[in-house]
Curated annotation (Swiss-Prot):
<dbReference type="GO" id="GO:0005886">
    <property type="term" value="C:plasma membrane"/>
</dbReference>
<feature type="topological domain" description="Periplasmic">
    <location>
        <begin position="250"/>
        <end position="255"/>
    </location>
</feature>
<keyword id="KW-0813">Transport</keyword>
<dbReference type="GO" id="GO:0055085">
    <property type="term" value="P:transmembrane transport"/>
</dbReference>
<feature type="transmembrane region" description="Helical">
    <location>
        <begin position="203"/>
        <end position="223"/>
    </location>
</feature>
<protein>
    <recommendedName>
        <fullName>Manganese transport system membrane protein MntB</fullName>
    </recommendedName>
</protein>
<feature type="transmembrane region" description="Helical">
    <location>
        <begin position="26"/>
        <end position="46"/>
    </location>
</feature>
<comment type="similarity">
    <text>Belongs to the ABC-3 integral membrane protein family.</text>
</comment>
<feature type="topological domain" description="Periplasmic">
    <location>
        <begin position="123"/>
        <end position="141"/>
    </location>
</feature>
<dbReference type="InterPro" id="IPR037294">
    <property type="entry name" value="ABC_BtuC-like"/>
</dbReference>
<feature type="topological domain" description="Cytoplasmic">
    <location>
        <begin position="224"/>
        <end position="228"/>
    </location>
</feature>
<feature type="topological domain" description="Cytoplasmic">
    <location>
        <begin position="93"/>
        <end position="101"/>
    </location>
</feature>
<feature type="transmembrane region" description="Helical">
    <location>
        <begin position="72"/>
        <end position="92"/>
    </location>
</feature>
<feature type="transmembrane region" description="Helical">
    <location>
        <begin position="49"/>
        <end position="69"/>
    </location>
</feature>
<keyword id="KW-0472">Membrane</keyword>
<keyword id="KW-0464">Manganese</keyword>
<feature type="transmembrane region" description="Helical">
    <location>
        <begin position="142"/>
        <end position="162"/>
    </location>
</feature>
Length: 306
Protein backbone atom coordinates (compact mmCIF):
# COMPACT_ATOMS: atom_id res chain seq x y z
CA UNK A 1 0.00 0.00 0.00
CA UNK A 2 2.85 2.37 0.87
CA UNK A 3 4.50 1.63 -2.46
CA UNK A 4 1.22 2.44 -4.19
CA UNK A 5 1.00 5.76 -2.37
CA UNK A 6 4.57 6.62 -3.32
CA UNK A 7 4.01 5.58 -6.92
CA UNK A 8 0.77 7.48 -7.22
CA UNK A 9 1.00 10.56 -4.98
CA UNK A 10 -1.65 12.37 -6.98
CA UNK A 11 -4.09 9.50 -6.48
CA UNK A 12 -3.50 9.63 -2.75
CA UNK A 13 -4.01 13.40 -2.81
CA UNK A 14 -7.23 12.87 -4.73
CA UNK A 15 -8.83 10.17 -2.57
CA UNK A 16 -7.62 11.32 0.85
CA UNK A 17 -10.54 13.73 1.49
CA UNK A 18 -13.04 11.01 0.57
CA UNK A 19 -12.06 9.10 3.70
CA UNK A 20 -13.92 11.63 5.82
CA UNK A 21 -17.69 11.53 6.02
CA UNK A 22 -18.00 15.23 6.90
CA UNK A 23 -16.16 16.20 3.73
CA UNK A 24 -18.22 13.94 1.48
CA UNK A 25 -21.32 15.48 3.04
CA UNK A 26 -19.97 18.97 2.48
CA UNK A 27 -19.20 18.23 -1.18
CA UNK A 28 -22.68 17.03 -2.12
CA UNK A 29 -24.43 19.72 -0.08
CA UNK A 30 -22.29 22.36 -1.78
CA UNK A 31 -23.05 20.85 -5.18
CA UNK A 32 -26.79 20.97 -4.47
CA UNK A 33 -26.56 24.59 -3.33
CA UNK A 34 -24.54 25.38 -6.45
CA UNK A 35 -27.27 23.86 -8.62
CA UNK A 36 -30.02 25.90 -6.94
CA UNK A 37 -28.04 29.14 -7.10
CA UNK A 38 -27.11 28.56 -10.74
CA UNK A 39 -30.71 28.06 -11.87
CA UNK A 40 -31.95 31.19 -10.10
CA UNK A 41 -28.85 33.11 -11.16
CA UNK A 42 -29.98 33.12 -14.79
CA UNK A 43 -33.24 34.86 -13.88
CA UNK A 44 -31.52 37.28 -11.49
CA UNK A 45 -29.00 38.20 -14.19
CA UNK A 46 -31.71 38.92 -16.77
CA UNK A 47 -33.73 40.90 -14.24
CA UNK A 48 -30.72 42.89 -13.01
CA UNK A 49 -31.40 42.07 -9.37
CA UNK A 50 -27.86 41.54 -8.09
CA UNK A 51 -28.29 44.39 -5.59
CA UNK A 52 -31.59 42.90 -4.43
CA UNK A 53 -29.85 39.60 -3.74
CA UNK A 54 -27.17 41.41 -1.77
CA UNK A 55 -29.85 43.18 0.27
CA UNK A 56 -31.72 40.00 1.15
CA UNK A 57 -28.54 38.12 2.05
CA UNK A 58 -27.66 40.81 4.61
CA UNK A 59 -31.22 41.13 5.87
CA UNK A 60 -31.39 37.50 7.04
CA UNK A 61 -28.81 38.02 9.81
CA UNK A 62 -31.25 39.06 12.58
CA UNK A 63 -33.52 36.18 11.59
CA UNK A 64 -30.70 33.66 11.95
CA UNK A 65 -29.70 35.03 15.36
CA UNK A 66 -33.26 35.02 16.69
CA UNK A 67 -33.90 31.53 15.30
CA UNK A 68 -30.95 30.06 17.16
CA UNK A 69 -31.81 32.02 20.31
CA UNK A 70 -35.41 30.73 20.24
CA UNK A 71 -34.28 27.22 19.27
CA UNK A 72 -36.28 27.13 16.04
CA UNK A 73 -35.01 26.17 12.55
CA UNK A 74 -32.68 28.87 11.23
CA UNK A 75 -34.38 28.66 7.82
CA UNK A 76 -37.62 29.99 9.30
CA UNK A 77 -35.96 33.02 10.85
CA UNK A 78 -33.78 33.70 7.81
CA UNK A 79 -36.64 33.46 5.32
CA UNK A 80 -38.96 35.58 7.48
CA UNK A 81 -36.51 38.46 7.74
CA UNK A 82 -35.28 38.07 4.16
CA UNK A 83 -38.77 38.22 2.70
CA UNK A 84 -39.71 40.92 5.23
CA UNK A 85 -36.88 43.05 3.89
CA UNK A 86 -38.21 42.77 0.34
CA UNK A 87 -41.70 43.78 1.49
CA UNK A 88 -40.18 46.73 3.35
CA UNK A 89 -38.26 47.76 0.23
CA UNK A 90 -41.42 47.63 -1.88
CA UNK A 91 -43.43 49.58 0.70
CA UNK A 92 -40.85 52.35 1.18
CA UNK A 93 -40.38 52.65 -2.58
CA UNK A 94 -44.14 53.02 -3.15
CA UNK A 95 -44.58 55.60 -0.38
CA UNK A 96 -41.58 57.84 -1.09
CA UNK A 97 -39.92 59.49 -4.06
CA UNK A 98 -36.67 57.62 -3.44
CA UNK A 99 -35.19 55.42 -6.15
CA UNK A 100 -35.01 51.67 -5.62
CA UNK A 101 -31.23 51.51 -5.14
CA UNK A 102 -31.39 54.07 -2.33
CA UNK A 103 -34.25 52.21 -0.63
CA UNK A 104 -32.40 48.90 -0.92
CA UNK A 105 -29.27 50.41 0.61
CA UNK A 106 -31.19 51.85 3.56
CA UNK A 107 -33.25 48.74 4.29
CA UNK A 108 -30.55 46.08 4.01
CA UNK A 109 -28.01 48.01 6.08
CA UNK A 110 -30.68 48.59 8.72
CA UNK A 111 -31.52 44.89 8.91
CA UNK A 112 -27.84 43.91 8.91
CA UNK A 113 -27.04 46.38 11.69
CA UNK A 114 -29.92 44.99 13.73
CA UNK A 115 -28.44 41.53 13.28
CA UNK A 116 -25.04 42.65 14.53
CA UNK A 117 -26.66 44.20 17.62
CA UNK A 118 -28.58 40.99 18.31
CA UNK A 119 -25.44 38.86 17.92
CA UNK A 120 -23.69 40.84 20.65
CA UNK A 121 -26.67 41.06 23.02
CA UNK A 122 -28.64 37.83 22.70
CA UNK A 123 -26.96 34.73 24.17
CA UNK A 124 -26.83 31.98 21.55
CA UNK A 125 -24.42 29.54 19.96
CA UNK A 126 -24.26 31.57 16.74
CA UNK A 127 -20.74 32.21 15.43
CA UNK A 128 -20.66 35.51 13.53
CA UNK A 129 -17.82 34.22 11.33
CA UNK A 130 -19.97 31.28 10.22
CA UNK A 131 -22.88 33.60 9.43
CA UNK A 132 -20.66 35.83 7.32
CA UNK A 133 -18.60 33.18 5.52
CA UNK A 134 -20.49 29.90 5.91
CA UNK A 135 -19.55 26.63 7.60
CA UNK A 136 -20.42 23.81 5.24
CA UNK A 137 -17.70 21.54 6.67
CA UNK A 138 -19.43 21.62 10.05
CA UNK A 139 -23.02 21.58 8.81
CA UNK A 140 -25.40 19.59 11.01
CA UNK A 141 -28.00 17.06 9.90
CA UNK A 142 -30.80 19.47 10.80
CA UNK A 143 -29.22 22.25 8.74
CA UNK A 144 -28.82 19.87 5.80
CA UNK A 145 -32.52 19.05 5.90
CA UNK A 146 -33.43 22.74 5.99
CA UNK A 147 -31.08 23.45 3.08
CA UNK A 148 -32.56 20.61 1.02
CA UNK A 149 -36.12 21.74 1.70
CA UNK A 150 -35.43 25.39 0.85
CA UNK A 151 -33.50 24.49 -2.29
CA UNK A 152 -36.06 21.94 -3.47
CA UNK A 153 -38.94 24.39 -3.09
CA UNK A 154 -36.98 26.92 -5.15
CA UNK A 155 -36.34 24.44 -7.96
CA UNK A 156 -39.97 23.26 -8.02
CA UNK A 157 -41.36 26.82 -8.16
CA UNK A 158 -38.98 27.80 -10.95
CA UNK A 159 -39.80 24.63 -12.88
CA UNK A 160 -43.54 25.25 -12.62
CA UNK A 161 -43.38 28.97 -13.50
CA UNK A 162 -40.32 28.89 -15.75
CA UNK A 163 -41.76 30.67 -18.79
CA UNK A 164 -43.73 33.25 -16.79
CA UNK A 165 -40.68 34.14 -14.69
CA UNK A 166 -38.51 34.38 -17.80
CA UNK A 167 -40.92 36.76 -19.52
CA UNK A 168 -41.27 38.83 -16.35
CA UNK A 169 -37.49 39.12 -15.98
CA UNK A 170 -36.89 40.01 -19.62
CA UNK A 171 -39.87 42.27 -20.40
CA UNK A 172 -42.29 42.98 -17.51
CA UNK A 173 -44.30 45.45 -19.62
CA UNK A 174 -45.02 42.82 -22.26
CA UNK A 175 -45.81 40.30 -19.52
CA UNK A 176 -48.37 42.69 -18.05
CA UNK A 177 -49.84 43.44 -21.49
CA UNK A 178 -50.62 39.77 -22.16
CA UNK A 179 -52.37 39.40 -18.80
CA UNK A 180 -49.59 38.02 -16.63
CA UNK A 181 -49.93 39.09 -13.00
CA UNK A 182 -46.58 40.81 -12.68
CA UNK A 183 -47.07 41.64 -9.01
CA UNK A 184 -47.43 37.93 -8.27
CA UNK A 185 -44.32 37.20 -10.34
CA UNK A 186 -42.45 39.95 -8.49
CA UNK A 187 -43.08 38.42 -5.09
CA UNK A 188 -42.66 34.88 -6.39
CA UNK A 189 -39.17 35.72 -7.61
CA UNK A 190 -38.38 37.49 -4.35
CA UNK A 191 -39.60 34.48 -2.38
CA UNK A 192 -37.43 31.98 -4.24
CA UNK A 193 -34.53 34.42 -3.98
CA UNK A 194 -34.94 34.49 -0.20
CA UNK A 195 -35.23 30.69 -0.11
CA UNK A 196 -32.09 30.29 -2.21
CA UNK A 197 -30.14 32.56 0.12
CA UNK A 198 -31.36 30.46 3.05
CA UNK A 199 -30.15 27.33 1.24
CA UNK A 200 -26.74 28.85 0.48
CA UNK A 201 -26.22 30.39 3.91
CA UNK A 202 -24.33 27.41 5.34
CA UNK A 203 -22.16 27.02 2.25
CA UNK A 204 -21.01 30.55 1.43
CA UNK A 205 -22.36 32.80 4.19
CA UNK A 206 -24.08 36.13 3.64
CA UNK A 207 -20.96 37.88 2.35
CA UNK A 208 -20.16 35.45 -0.46
CA UNK A 209 -23.64 34.20 -1.37
CA UNK A 210 -24.20 37.12 -3.72
CA UNK A 211 -21.37 35.81 -5.89
CA UNK A 212 -23.07 32.42 -6.15
CA UNK A 213 -26.30 34.17 -7.14
CA UNK A 214 -24.82 36.44 -9.81
CA UNK A 215 -21.63 34.92 -11.23
CA UNK A 216 -22.98 31.62 -12.70
CA UNK A 217 -25.71 33.41 -14.64
CA UNK A 218 -23.21 36.00 -15.82
CA UNK A 219 -20.94 33.25 -17.12
CA UNK A 220 -23.83 31.69 -19.03
CA UNK A 221 -24.91 35.11 -20.32
CA UNK A 222 -21.46 35.67 -21.82
CA UNK A 223 -21.23 32.23 -23.38
CA UNK A 224 -24.62 31.86 -25.07
CA UNK A 225 -27.61 33.68 -26.56
CA UNK A 226 -30.05 30.86 -25.86
CA UNK A 227 -31.56 30.72 -22.39
CA UNK A 228 -31.43 26.92 -22.16
CA UNK A 229 -27.73 26.97 -23.03
CA UNK A 230 -27.18 29.85 -20.61
CA UNK A 231 -28.81 27.73 -17.91
CA UNK A 232 -26.57 24.79 -18.73
CA UNK A 233 -23.35 26.81 -18.60
CA UNK A 234 -24.49 28.40 -15.35
CA UNK A 235 -25.18 25.06 -13.67
CA UNK A 236 -21.93 23.44 -14.82
CA UNK A 237 -19.76 26.36 -13.70
CA UNK A 238 -21.52 26.66 -10.34
CA UNK A 239 -21.56 22.96 -9.42
CA UNK A 240 -17.97 22.51 -10.59
CA UNK A 241 -16.84 25.47 -8.49
CA UNK A 242 -18.67 24.18 -5.41
CA UNK A 243 -17.26 20.66 -5.66
CA UNK A 244 -13.72 21.73 -6.52
CA UNK A 245 -13.77 24.59 -4.01
CA UNK A 246 -14.86 22.31 -1.17
CA UNK A 247 -12.24 19.77 -2.19
CA UNK A 248 -9.39 22.28 -2.36
CA UNK A 249 -10.39 24.03 0.86
CA UNK A 250 -9.57 20.81 2.69
CA UNK A 251 -6.10 20.48 1.16
CA UNK A 252 -5.14 24.14 1.55
CA UNK A 253 -6.92 24.64 4.89
CA UNK A 254 -8.78 27.77 3.77
CA UNK A 255 -12.37 29.03 3.90
CA UNK A 256 -14.63 26.74 1.86
CA UNK A 257 -16.95 29.54 0.77
CA UNK A 258 -13.99 31.71 -0.15
CA UNK A 259 -12.39 28.98 -2.26
CA UNK A 260 -15.68 28.30 -4.05
CA UNK A 261 -16.06 31.96 -4.98
CA UNK A 262 -12.40 32.24 -6.06
CA UNK A 263 -12.86 29.36 -8.51
CA UNK A 264 -16.20 30.74 -9.70
CA UNK A 265 -14.65 34.16 -10.27
CA UNK A 266 -11.75 32.57 -12.15
CA UNK A 267 -14.22 30.84 -14.48
CA UNK A 268 -15.97 34.17 -15.00
CA UNK A 269 -12.70 35.87 -15.96
CA UNK A 270 -11.98 33.06 -18.44
CA UNK A 271 -15.47 33.45 -19.94
CA UNK A 272 -15.17 37.24 -20.03
CA UNK A 273 -11.93 37.00 -21.98
CA UNK A 274 -12.55 33.96 -24.16
CA UNK A 275 -16.31 33.80 -24.79
CA UNK A 276 -16.79 33.03 -28.53
CA UNK A 277 -19.16 35.94 -29.23
CA UNK A 278 -19.13 38.33 -26.28
CA UNK A 279 -15.64 37.80 -24.88
CA UNK A 280 -13.02 40.54 -24.89
CA UNK A 281 -10.86 38.73 -27.44
CA UNK A 282 -13.82 38.12 -29.77
CA UNK A 283 -14.90 41.76 -29.58
CA UNK A 284 -11.39 42.98 -30.32
CA UNK A 285 -11.20 40.62 -33.28
CA UNK A 286 -14.50 41.93 -34.67
CA UNK A 287 -13.35 45.53 -34.27
CA UNK A 288 -10.32 44.79 -36.39
CA UNK A 289 -12.34 42.78 -38.92
CA UNK A 290 -15.02 45.44 -39.38
CA UNK A 291 -18.60 45.97 -38.06
CA UNK A 292 -20.89 42.96 -37.69
CA UNK A 293 -24.68 43.43 -37.99
CA UNK A 294 -25.21 40.71 -35.39
CA UNK A 295 -23.59 42.92 -32.75
CA UNK A 296 -26.63 45.19 -32.80
CA UNK A 297 -28.84 42.32 -31.65
CA UNK A 298 -26.74 41.94 -28.49
CA UNK A 299 -28.36 39.45 -26.10
CA UNK A 300 -32.01 40.09 -27.01
CA UNK A 301 -32.17 36.69 -28.69
CA UNK A 302 -31.99 35.00 -25.31
CA UNK A 303 -35.78 34.93 -25.00
CA UNK A 304 -36.54 34.77 -28.71
CA UNK A 305 -34.87 31.37 -28.97
CA UNK A 306 -36.26 29.78 -25.79
Amino acid sequence: MNQLVVAFPFWHWLVEPLQYEFLIRAIWVSAFVGLVCAVLSCYITLKGWSLMGDAISHAVVPGVVLAYALNIPFAIGAFTFGFGATVAIGYVKSKTRLKEDAVIGIVFTGFFALGLVLVTKIPSNVDLFHILFGNVLGISQQDIIQTLIAGSITLIVILLRRKDLLLFCFDPNHAKAIGLRTQVMYYTLLSVLALTIVAALQTAGIILVISMLVTPGSIGYLLSDRFDHMLWYSVVSSVLSCVLGTYLSYHFDVSTGGMIVVILTTLFVIAMIGAPKYGILAQEWRKRSGPNPEDDENQTVVVDQV
